[in-house]
Amino acid sequence: MKRLDTSAAGFSEDFATLLAARGSDERSVAEPVRAILADVRSRGDEALCDYTARFDRLTLPAEKLRISAEEIASEAARVPADLMDALRTAARRIETFHAAQMPKDLDFTDEDGIRLGMRWTPLDAVGLYVPGGKAAYPSSVLMNALPARVAGVKRLAMCVPSPDGVLNPLVLAAAQLCGVEEIYRIGGAQAVGAMAFGTDLIAPVDRIVGPGNAYVAEAKRQVFGHVGIDSIAGPSEVVVVADGQNDPRLVALDLLAQAEHDEQAQAILITTDAAFAERAAEAVRKELETLPRTAIASKSWEDHGAIIVVRSLEEAAEIVNALAPEHLEVMLDAPRDFSAMIRHAGAIFMGRYCPEAVGDYVGGPNHVLPTSRTARFASGLSVFDFIKRTTTIEADEAGLRRIGPAGVALAKAEGLDAHALSLSVRLEKN
């Protein structure tokens, strides 16, 4: 864990090192992913069956790769009632928030008599990638599927690996809640390829969303342009801005809630109180002694964690904007005032009773957020990822006579004679 102080000599260099330190894994998966995608594109279902046997130790004919409605219902029925209630609560809140995001169409006539508009229409088909096995996350199903449903996407196809044939009941229950009926027991880059290019079994989709390992992320990168994708997700990250009035144990737990995700995850505390910084560091050490995922969390905290002592909240805001974190917790008396200074963050959690874990499950806004400082230019997943804009222009003869001459002049200036003629011939009639 790195300790930085903005009043110390060399802070700028140390902070630059902190920004550059993460995500330097040199292991390239580009070539094996490229080979898998080419194979799926060439051999289709046969390749899917081969990779499923190889990576998931599951040998099935192509027609059995789709999970039947009976299997989905049977697995979902195994979920305890309290967990189903929790899924329903999360689904209700996620759906409500994303429904409020839906934009309205635009239609007006301007001062030249030209009718202008903009229509929003949903994508036809979306592919959902869901990690499988023991590390399956039903919350990710809700966060990816529900915005698509709210947006009006008619077809949702989901791919989830089932190592050794084991299905995850919670994942299937979440899919059932979202109305996802087309589910395949396929994972990895091969699943991304199947959804992007299509096979006899799986019709191609228009956009692929959902988290995955390095192979899945690279596959999404390589199929982008053929289909849309949500983002290339990096390791999770949180920045906690806290004053000395906080319980150091709560701050420690919030930091470790990110650290336990992945050895590459990053958790950073920013505070104006140097004494509190020490108490928080000690609290992290104590929690790591009993945390079930202590090996992962300890590695993350040791390699990528940081505590930064600042001279003012204004300075804290500058650092947050430079970090552009995926998650920002503001544990201050006036969290809204501080948040007003923040330009770059995927999601902001305000107040001492709003840990980032609220947003992971039951807050309502999406937990699929920009990582690796991409919050400088990107946003979290929303209904806008599943709809697109089409602009409309309607002009009658009178309207064209008002604006057409300017168009003719510009077309001639660009040397595009047919463009100019398509306007001028209409203007010369009558």
From Swiss-Prot:
Residue numbers binding NAD(+): 129, 190, 213
Pathway(s): Amino-acid biosynthesis; L-histidine biosynthesis; L-histidine from 5-phospho-alpha-D-ribose 1-diphosphate: step 9/9
Active site: 326 (proton acceptor), 327 (proton acceptor)
Role, per record: Catalyzes the sequential NAD-dependent oxidations of L-histidinol to L-histidinaldehyde and then to L-histidine.
Domain of life: Bacteria
Cofactor note: Binds 1 zinc ion per subunit.
Gene3D superfamilies on file: 1.20.5.1300, Nitrogenase molybdenum iron protein domain
GO biological process: L-histidine biosynthetic process
Cofactor: Zn(2+)
Enzyme class, broadest EC rank: oxidoreductase
A GO term, aspect molecular function: NAD binding
One GO CC annotation: cytosol
Protein known as: Histidinol dehydrogenase
Catalytically driven reaction(s): L-histidinol + 2 NAD(+) + H2O = L-histidine + 2 NADH + 3 H(+)
